[in-house]
């Protein structure tokens, strides 16, 4: 029974080490990054993106 307990503890330690090494992909630089500007063309592009998101039915604008 003692050998089984030791084997279980070693397996748990190896798994936890593997999880710590692999991580979740969240790098410290990602947390502090400035959000990317999705609308570099300015206000009109923001408006057009909003119309596209709400499935604009105005043909001259949304095409």
Swiss-Prot record:
Gene Ontology CC entries for this record: extracellular region
**Which residues are processed away as propeptide to yield the mature protein?**
24-55
Disulphide bridges, residue numbers: 56-62
Tissue spec. comment: Expressed by the venom duct.
> Which positions does the record annotate as the modified residue D-tryptophan?
58
- PTM annotation, UniProt: D-chirality of Trp-58 ('Trp-3' in the mature Contryphan-Vc2 peptide) seems to be only protective against proteolytic degradation, since [L-Trp3]-contryphan-Vc2 is degraded by trypsin within 4 hours, while [D-Trp3]-contryphan-Vc2 is not affected and the toxicity of both [D-Trp3]- and [L-Trp3]-contryphan-Vc2 is similar when intractranially injected into mice. It is also noteworthy that neither [D-Trp3]- nor [L-Trp3]-contryphan-Vc2 is susceptible to cleavage by pepsin or alpha-chymotrypsin over the 4 hours duration of the assay.
Q: Which UniProt keywords apply?
A: Amidation, D-amino acid, Disulfide bond, Lipid-binding, Neurotoxin, Secreted, Signal, Toxin
Q: Where on the tree of life does the source sit, at the highest rank?
A: Eukaryota
Question: Cysteine amide occurs at which residues?
Answer: 62
What family classification does the UniProt entry report for this protein?
Answer: Belongs to the O2 superfamily. Contryphan family.
State any further remark.
Exists in two forms, due to cis-trans isomerization at 59-Thr-Pro-60. The trans conformation is the major form, with a cis:trans ratio of 1:5.
Protein name (record):
Contryphan-Vc2
Specify the species: Conus victoriae
Q: What is the lineage of its organism?
A: Eukaryota, Metazoa, Spiralia, Lophotrochozoa, Mollusca
């Amino acid at each position: 029974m003692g050998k089984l307990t030791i084997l279980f503890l070693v397996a748990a330690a190896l798994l936890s080490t593997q999880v710590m090494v692999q991580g979740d992909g969240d790098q410290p630089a990602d947390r502090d990054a400035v959000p990317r500007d999705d609308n570099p063309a300015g206000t009109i592009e923001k408006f057009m993106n909003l119309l596209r998101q709400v499935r604009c039915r105005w043909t001259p604008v949304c095409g």
